[in-house]
């Protein structure tokens, strides 16, 4: 399906804008990874009345029993054992923050993911953050150049220059985005194994912010391919039109009719030709057809001076200029 140069430019702008929106949303949200954490249930005196022997039905059954003694260390005591002592809470993590569900009520508690990352991975995490910022900035530059190309659509040369620069910036942004996403994934996986005990996930998976980030990368690369395709097609079309223009208006070199040469040679040998008739040998001129292929001996394109020289050379017959 053939598309115009302006149509290809509009498609590239739309893809670049979509990539920019996806990348910005993913960078600012905290749903790159999400899952559950296994935490101990709150004991007696910490809002965990259901776990206390003197609450509810346990208080009625044990109304005559002696008060429950605290543990030697003074910590709340839990009567449950095994996996019943733990409960799962949901969490979600982004580049900047990790938020966990509050067990005692609605709301979330957030802390910096940079502080949660192991010391050995903080440098990689900061490099990932810088790469994400550069990724977004290069997307903005590429988007601006593509918009300028639309404004200069009447000028082919200016449009080609802007198209080339937009393609370069878009490709560079896509490469930076891919590296940034991979580095963050590596840091998160290491933090799952070596992070703080109270944060380590029991189970986790990638969230919608992670999907947006890779969707942004996909749109970015699609925009770069579309821009490069537009640049290549425009150059090829320009060269083709120029070649057709040059060949369509060039005249074929003048040549002598071989039958006329044979006729005058025979008459000269017989002595029947006069001087006036000797000047009547004319050169034939023909214009190239639309799809004319030059002779093997011809070398095109030729300048007008070369064509004039060949005209004079081929019209010199039998000692006279024709």
Curated annotation (Swiss-Prot):
InterPro entries: GSG-1, PMP-22/EMP/MP20-like. The modification Phosphoserine is found at residue 274. GO terms for cellular component: asymmetric synapse; glutamatergic synapse; plasma membrane; postsynaptic density membrane; Schaffer collateral - CA1 synapse. It is a multi-pass membrane protein. Residues 30-122, 185-207 are extracellular. It comes from the Eukaryota. Keywords: Cell membrane, Membrane, Phosphoprotein, Synapse, Transmembrane, Transmembrane helix. The keyword Transmembrane applies. Expressed in the brain (at protein level). Disulfide bonds: none annotated. It is found in: Cell membrane; Synapse. Component of the inner core of AMPAR complexes. AMPAR complexes consist of an inner core made of 4 pore-forming GluA/GRIA proteins (GRIA1, GRIA2, GRIA3 and GRIA4) and 4 major auxiliary subunits arranged in a twofold symmetry. One of the two pairs of distinct binding sites is occupied either by CNIH2, CNIH3 or CACNG2, CACNG3. The other harbors CACNG2, CACNG3, CACNG4, CACNG8 or GSG1L. This inner core of AMPAR complexes is complemented by outer core constituents binding directly to the GluA/GRIA proteins at sites distinct from the interaction sites of the inner core constituents. As a component of the inner core of AMPAR complexes, modifies AMPA receptor (AMPAR) gating. Belongs to the GSG1 family. This is Germ cell-specific gene 1-like protein.
């Amino acid at each position: 399906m053939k598309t115009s140069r302006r149509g290809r430019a509009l498609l590239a702008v739309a893809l670049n804008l979509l990539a920019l929106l996806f990348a910005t949303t993913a960078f600012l949200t905290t749903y790159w990874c999400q899952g559950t954490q296994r935490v101990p249930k709150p004991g007696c005196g910490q809002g965990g009345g259901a776990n206390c022997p003197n609450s509810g039905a346990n208080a009625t059954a044990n109304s005559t029993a002696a008060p429950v003694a605290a543990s030697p260390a003074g910590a709340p005591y839990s009567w449950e054992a095994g996996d019943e002592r733990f409960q799962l809470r949901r969490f979600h993590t982004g580049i900047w923050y990790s938020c966990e569900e509050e067990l005692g009520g609605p709301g979330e508690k957030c802390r910096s993911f940079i502080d949660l990352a192991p010391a050995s991975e903080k440098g990689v995490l900061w490099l990932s953050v810088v790469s994400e910022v550069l990724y977004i900035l290069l997307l903005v530059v590429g988007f601006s150049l593509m918009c300028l190309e639309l404004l200069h659509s009447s000028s082919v040369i200016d449009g080609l220059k802007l198209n080339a620069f937009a393609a370069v910036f878009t490709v560079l942004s896509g490469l930076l985005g891919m590296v940034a996403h991979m580095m963050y994934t590596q840091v998160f996986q290491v933090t799952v194994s070596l992070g703080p005990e109270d944060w380590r996930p029991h189970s986790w998976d990638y969230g919608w912010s992670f999907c947006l980030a890779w969707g942004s990368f996909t749109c970015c690369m699609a925009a770069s391919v579309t821009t490069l395709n537009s640049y290549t097609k425009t150059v090829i079309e320009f060269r083709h039109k120029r070649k057709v223009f040059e060949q369509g208006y060039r005249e074929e070199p003048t040549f002598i009719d071989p039958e006329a040469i044979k006729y005058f040679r025979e008459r000269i040998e017989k002595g029947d030709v006069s001087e006036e008739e000797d000047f009547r040998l004319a050169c034939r001129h023909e214009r190239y057809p639309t799809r004319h292929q030059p002779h093997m001996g011809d070398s095109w394109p030729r300048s007008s001076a070369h064509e004039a020289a060949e005209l004079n050379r081929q019209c010199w017959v039998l000692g006279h200029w024709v």
